[in-house]
Amino acid sequence: MIKMFIISKNHLDIIYNFVDWEFKNISSIGNIINDEVVWNELPKGVEGVLCGVDGSRGKVEFCSGIVYGLSSYAIGKNIEKGMFELGVLPFFKEEDRVRRLMMTLEYRLATLVSKNVDLILLDGTLSGALIMPPLLSGDTNPLTVYPDLAEDLGWKFIKSLDNFWDEVLENLDGNIYDNTLLAIKIFQKFDSTYSEYVEDIREELFAANILNSRLEIACWGVYFEYIELLHSLNRLLEYDCTFIAKNFENSIITEKLKENNINVDILLDATLLNQIFRGRGYTTLKLEDCYNKKRSRRHINKICDVFGDYFKFLEVIRENPFEMIPKTYVRFAESSPILALEVPRTNKKSIEEVISLLIPYSKLGYPRYLKDAHNKAKISKKEFKKQILFMIKYISEKNRDFSLFFQSGREVLGE
């Protein structure tokens, strides 16, 4: 039998040489980095009420679209709540749409548990949520193709979201929530849950006779989903929160050195800082952040022009993202990896106060509540497949003809 995957010495040498190259580059600019970056001692830890929120997603492709599952979990002192969603999407930007829906779910749950909490912890970065590549551009963006209608319906949808979430917040009577995403209800005429909030939007869209293809329907769906993501962030930023990333691909430090005509290779901040600063500590970059560039904000500008009066934080980001979302790198425990912290300027607490609150719960290098939330929210492939098989069985028993929808094409491979 032929082994299809064999690691040769040549493969290993290529990887070794790459690591060797990075190591030598870091060693050669260590003194420059020490002049540019101040590594501060950690402040004294302070006890507080913290809550970690994380999410997970899974999806299965079928011939007519994808079925996705989303989960979000919040864990803190005397806090344990979850949100779950199961839905279907056509084949159009489905990977990014599911990711954004998951982020919206996380921000919604974080807002729900924020009362009487000193600090909400979220996995990932706020800057990544805001500057990720736009899913709509040119003739796929309703704000470009149908500006008046898109603006009118956008404002109506924001009002619907306000009313919807006021009702949700008034009726917190459990630990598990579902059907909390409103944008996906607009085109789901078959779903009566909360349909009264979007019925007028749905009727106006179809009356305009512009939804003549699955692509057009999908584009409008993405548009409303993005507004809902911004709305969820708008509510969340009313409270003190911090975004914590384990993995980050920024190269802010060496990019800035390059701009200042210092001859260095572009290296990732994580690689650089982990090698040069070995002990516990933190630094908040004084440098202008690399995502403060016009090309990164272009897709924010259009939606900000229309809805900036409501989403005030977008105006700040448009002017200077670094002012809104400064970048802090921190190591909580000896030999643990450096984490990236983003503490929005909307917080009442300073970066130093946030770090002080995190210290008692990060003795192993990572906030305990965030780790617990991750483990609770995680959707395993095995478990998700079981749930999908249960769904297929349930639907097929009600109507055998519907089983055709759940063919994936991989049946010929015995999968």
From Swiss-Prot:
Pfam families: NurA (PF09376)
SMART domains hit by this protein: NurA
Alphabetized InterPro entries for the sequence: NurA-like, NurA_domain
This protein's UniProt keywords: Plasmid
Protein name listed in UniProt: Uncharacterized protein MJECL07
Organism field: Methanocaldococcus jannaschii (strain ATCC 43067 / DSM 2661 / JAL-1 / JCM 10045 / NBRC 100440)
